[in-house]
Structures are given as C-alpha cells and as structure tokens.
A protein has these predicted regions:
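Long amphipathic alpha-helical segments used for membrane anchoring, targeting, substrate engagement
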Residues: 1-30, 81-101
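Stable alpha-helical structural segments in soluble proteins, enriched in small hydrophobic residues
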Residues: 70, 74-85
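N-terminal intrinsically disordered, cationic/polar leader segments
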Residues: 28-52, 59
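Short acidic, glycine/proline-rich loop/turn micro-motifs
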Residues: 53-54, 64
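Residue-level signature of catalytic and energy-coupling elements of molecular machines
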Residues: 12, 46, 71
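A short, polar/charged loop-to-alpha-helix boundary motif
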Residues: 59-68
Length: 101
C-alpha cells in the first residue's frame, strides 16, 4: 500500500512539473489573429504583443468604425487560438488527473 502512494506521489510530481513546463511554453508562444487589414499578436496570457494595421493612401476617417470592428475580430481570432492551443496542450493533464480520483 505504501509503495502505491509513493508511486502516485512521484507520478503527481512528474505531472506537475510537465504541466508547469507546458504552461511556461504556452506563455512564451505568440498567436496571430487576422482580420482583413489588421494583424494582432497575443502571447499565451492573451496580452497584446503587437497590432499591425495595413492601410494605404485611400484610407479615410469614415472607415475608422470599420477598422475598429476589424481590430476586434482579429483580437478574438488570436484569443481563440490561445484557448485552443492551451486546451490541446493542457487537456492531457486534466485527463490524467481524472484517473487518480
């Protein structure tokens, strides 16, 4: 019985170390959201790293509202990519914990 608990503790520590490493990797990863003229880059914490707007001389002030909408779409696109990658990379740890309970 004692060996099983020790093995479980070792496995839990190993899983915790792997989880922490994966979380650190995700935080360092950049995700780019794109919407027509807008590119937004977020890190794994969903902090905005950069915003790039591609406009030319024909851009008019009336287009500002549309540009704001495109920024929002690009941000949401990048945020979805962060969530999907986190789910993909961290989901396996949640599945492993379910077997221990």
């Amino acid at each position: 019985m004692n060996m099983n608990i020790q093995n479980l503790m070792r496995e839990a520590q190993k899983m915790q170390k792997n989880l922490q490493k994966t979380q650190e990797e995700l935080e360092k990863t950049n995700y780019e959201g794109v919407s027509s003229l807008i590119n937004i880059t977020l890190n794994g914490n969903k902090d905005v790293v950069s915003v790039k707007i591609k406009v030319d001389d024909s851009f008019e002030k009336e287009d500002l509202e549309m540009l704001e909408d495109m920024i929002l779409v690009a941000f949401k696109d990048a945020a979805k990519k962060v969530d999907a990658d986190k789910e993909k990379k961290l989901g396996k740890y949640g599945q492993g914990l379910a077997g221990l309970m």
